Amino acid sequence: MTSEHGAEAALAAAAMTLRPNLKVLIGGSFGVALISALFLPWPLALASTTLGAFMLAGADIDARTFLLPDLMTAGALLSGLVAAATFDPVSAWFGVATATARAAGTALVLGGVRAGYARLRGREGLGLGDIKLAAALGAWLPVEAIPLCFALATAAALITVLLATLRGQRIERTTRVPLGAFLCPAVWLTYFGSALVG
């Protein structure tokens, strides 16, 4: 009985860990909603706020746990497909089809990077959650904006590592870096910028 209670407690603790910090989520979502409402027409502002909420949750959880919950990545992917169907100038079906193709292509590319790194280094560098996040960003972003999104995330990660090194923190080749914590904000920034100019 004790072991059963211990297992239940461990599962409950894990579930709590994979929940976003409500202060971060609510406060951040309010900020995203305000910025979106100020600069975008209301349908795009609603889409931007939805994406921002998912990305805030993902960044917060990944920064603490190095995990991206399926609920977050799947929700971001599905809402991206809904947005594609809503805003595509040709038709809803065409929007969903092109968004699905972008999602699959982006996930396949990052999956290839993951497999290549594992073969080369003998250990995993990217988690499956990162691949699912790549699919979600592919659904949301125009294809020409996807490289910019990854560039922003990479630059932010490198700056963070550099600052940690300057503060005296020991950074090694095997030091884990939560990609989602940097990629999630980059996804929203790229989407917002794309919506703003286009």
Stretch-by-stretch model annotation:
Residues M1-G198:
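A membrane-topology feature that recognizes alpha-helical transmembrane segments
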